[in-house]
């Protein structure tokens, strides 16, 4: 605490502040504080004033020093009462509020708070999911793509979401179009509506069932959404990669140890507090003979095995994953096929980026995906526990039974993968993966009562004939073959734990087939025309250097590096208050940085004294 000219200025630690709207951006300063900061309050002695009048050169120098002191003090003091100009956008409002800055001042180049970027990102974020589940994305690690200073300011603004643009919307549509070409969506809306309506009718008849024994029929919560994502963007996609040589939109993740500046490679490290969950979605993976891309003999062997080993329903083989996984891995080892990893960038004009840093960031994005896939394919046990940790960090119970609606939806869309496994779960049989088989909980799962029509409903003697006729009439699938054998009380319910087990085994199939070729496709978002493809050779040393740099940024262990290309500033939401964008001199920048540095020091001192 310091006393200055009869006014007490107390350095206060940073406290959470909400990002206000543009109509709430007026800040103020009291008349007393305004006077205390005026040049008349620098407390010059009478002798000094006489000397200044007789010695112009000394006067000039001292006034300059006083102005410097004034600037430093002013940059430390927060405005309170006098009306100040509004900030031009919510991002600026956020960072000025969080950093307690005077809106008349430029943004400092130095973080004046006690929070490192990752801590701040995990506590002050407009997207509350990052507060509930602290994590980073692959794109968040690419801090040097445009301007590190902008990335830095975005974090401390509270990660304010920028409005979606027309180009972004078109890009999203193109990604969905490319995904549907390989993974056509099966619309189960009508089936789900029928099941919900039927369940509502039956619920009125089930007044004798104790609440604690009820199996959840309808649940559209986050656990269910994650289950669908794992089933479709992991299990189905990896199976498609084995059977059809390509897949799009595959979920990947890793755990970045910010202290060691490297990704975790053993399951014991996963739960450490310094291990940060990093998630990403790889746009496209191709599985091919790199020296002869037209070679399809591996897939002929895979399909030959599947067609001969498994029964079919509607000309679709019902694959037993317990048998398929070890056999597929053995077949893959007989061929020199490799995975290649591609990121798709959409462009609103028929040209690729000219900025080298943007091109480099895109390259490293593919390196991250390649590295994640490598980590997830090395050891199925590591991947299994990695997925379990992923779900638990999101607050999910991995042993919670999935709702009936989710289970029947997954069965309808992907019965070729899940039917045989669901039979095993229903009968309480092992699936052949010991980490799951040894820990799966035996919980009664009522997969029978809800699959009746109200006109023939019975708890004691369920009759499914009319129900099966009704649901088969919706889309013509042989439900009598894929549903009837499952209509019982299951001994082991379907859970996130089960999905983690199968996903980890599918990753491991590719253990010896990870390639080093990555690429970035640039496509015109209006037509999907391929404008250019940049091909890269994965280099671990180069990648690790990038990981270390990103780790130091998020750990607050290095200074941020502003862009040298000031033409980029015109696209930045912080331009109007950025000293770099304003072309300020080094001396001016340093002077305006001293105050925030002092504020940071005082914050740290006060925090230490309280701790």
Curated annotation (Swiss-Prot):
Pfam families for the chain: Exo5 (PF09810)
GO cellular-component term (any): nucleus
Similarity field: Belongs to the EXO5 family.
Region of interest (Disordered), residue spans: 19-42
Entry keywords, A to Z: 4Fe-4S, DNA-binding, Exonuclease, Hydrolase, Iron, Iron-sulfur, Magnesium, Metal-binding, Mitochondrion, Nuclease, Transit peptide
Record function comment: Single strand DNA specific 5'exonuclease involved in mitochondrial DNA replication and recombination. Releases dinucleotides as main products of catalysis. Has the capacity to slide across 5'double-stranded DNA or 5'RNA sequences and resumes cutting two nucleotides downstream of the double-stranded-to-single-stranded junction or RNA-to-DNA junction, respectively.
Species for this entry: Candida albicans (strain WO-1)
Recorded superkingdom: Eukaryota
Parts forming coiled coils: none
Textual note on the cofactor: Binds 1 [4Fe-4S] cluster.
InterPro entries linked: EXOV
EC numbers for this chain: 3.1.-.-
Subcellular localization(s) per the UniProt record: Mitochondrion
Subunit structure and binding partners: Monomer.
Key word Nucleotide-binding present: no
Cofactor: Mg(2+); [4Fe-4S] cluster
Keyword DNA repair: no
Primary residence: mitochondrion
Protein name from the UniProt record: Exonuclease V, mitochondrial
Binding residue positions for [4Fe-4S] cluster: 147, 569, 572, 578
Biased composition (Basic and acidic residues): 21-35
GO BP annotation list: interstrand cross-link repair
GO molecular-function term, one example from the UniProt record: DNA binding
Underlying gene: EXO5
């Amino acid at each position: 605490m310091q006393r200055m000219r009869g006014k007490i200025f107390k350095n206060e630690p940073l406290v959470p502040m909400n990002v206000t709207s543009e109509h709430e951006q007026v800040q103020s300063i009291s008349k007393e504080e305004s006077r205390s900061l005026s040049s008349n309050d620098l407390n010059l002695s009478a002798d000094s004033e006489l000397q200044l009048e007789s010695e112009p050169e000394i006067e000039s120098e001292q006034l300059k020093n006083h102005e410097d002191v004034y600037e430093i003090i002013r940059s430390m003091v927060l405005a309170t009462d006098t009306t100040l100009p509004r900030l031009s956008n919510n991002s600026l409002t956020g960072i000025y509020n969080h950093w307690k800055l005077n809106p008349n001042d430029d943004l400092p180049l130095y973080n004046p708070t006690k929070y490192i970027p990752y801590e701040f990102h995990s506590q002050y974020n407009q997207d509350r999911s990052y507060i509930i589940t602290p994590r980073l994305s692959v794109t968040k690690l690419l801090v040097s793509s445009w301007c590190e200073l902008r990335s830095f300011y975005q974090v401390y603004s509270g990660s304010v979401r920028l409005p979606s643009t027309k180009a972004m919307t078109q890009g999203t549509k193109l990604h969905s179009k490319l995904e549907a070409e390989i993974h056509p969506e099966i619309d189960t809306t009508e089936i789900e509506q029928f099941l919900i309506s039927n369940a509502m009718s039956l619920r009125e008849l089930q007044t004798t069932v104790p609440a604690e024994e009820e199996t959840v029929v309808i649940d559209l919560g986050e656990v269910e959404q994650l289950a669908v994502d794992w089933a479709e963007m992991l299990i189905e996609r990896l199976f498609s990669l084995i059977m059809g040589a390509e897949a799009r939109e595959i979920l990947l993740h890793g755990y970045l140890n910010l202290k060691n500046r490297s990704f975790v490679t053993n399951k014991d490290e996963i739960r450490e507090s310094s291990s940060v969950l990093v998630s990403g979605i790889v746009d496209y993976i191709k599985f091919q003979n790199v020296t002869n891309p037209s070679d399809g003999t591996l897939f002929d062997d895979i399909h030959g095995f599947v067609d001969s080993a498994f029964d079919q329903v509607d000309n679709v083989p019902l694959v037993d994953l317990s048998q398929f996984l070890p056999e597929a891995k053995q077949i893959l080892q007989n061929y020199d096929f490799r995975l290649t990893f591609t990121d798709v960038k959409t462009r609103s004009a028929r040209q690729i980026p000219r900025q080298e840093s943007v091109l480099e960031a895109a390259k490293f994005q593919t390196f991250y995906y390649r590295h994640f896939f490598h980590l997830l394919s090395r050891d199925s046990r590591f991947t299994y526990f990695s997925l379990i940790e992923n779900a638990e960090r999101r607050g999910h119970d991995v042993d919670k039974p999935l709702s009936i609606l989710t289970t029947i939806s997954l069965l309808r869309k992907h019965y070729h993968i899940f039917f045989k496994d669901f039979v095993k779960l229903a009968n309480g049989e092992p699936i052949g993966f010991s980490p799951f088989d040894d820990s799966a909980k035996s919980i009664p799962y009522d997969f029978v009562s809800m699959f009746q029509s109200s006109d023939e409903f019975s708890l004691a003697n369920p009759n499914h004939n009319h129900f099966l006729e009704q649901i088969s009439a919706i889309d013509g699938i042989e439900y009598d073959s894929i549903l009837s054998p499952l209509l019982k009380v299951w001994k082991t319910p379907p859970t996130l734990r089960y999905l983690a087990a199968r996903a980890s085994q599918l990753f491991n199939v590719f253990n010896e087939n990870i390639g080093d070729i990555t690429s970035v496709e640039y496509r015109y978002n209006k037509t999907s025309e391929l404008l250019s493809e940049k091909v890269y050779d994965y280099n671990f040393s180069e990648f690790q250097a990038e990981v270390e740099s990103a780790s130091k940024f998020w750990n607050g262990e290095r200074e941020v590096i502003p862009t040298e290309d000031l033409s980029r500033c015109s696209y930045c939401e912080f331009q109007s208050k950025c000293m770099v964008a304003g072309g300020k001199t080094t001396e001016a920048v340093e002077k305006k940085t001293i105050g925030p540095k002092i504020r940071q020091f005082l914050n740290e001192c006060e925090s230490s004294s309280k701790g």
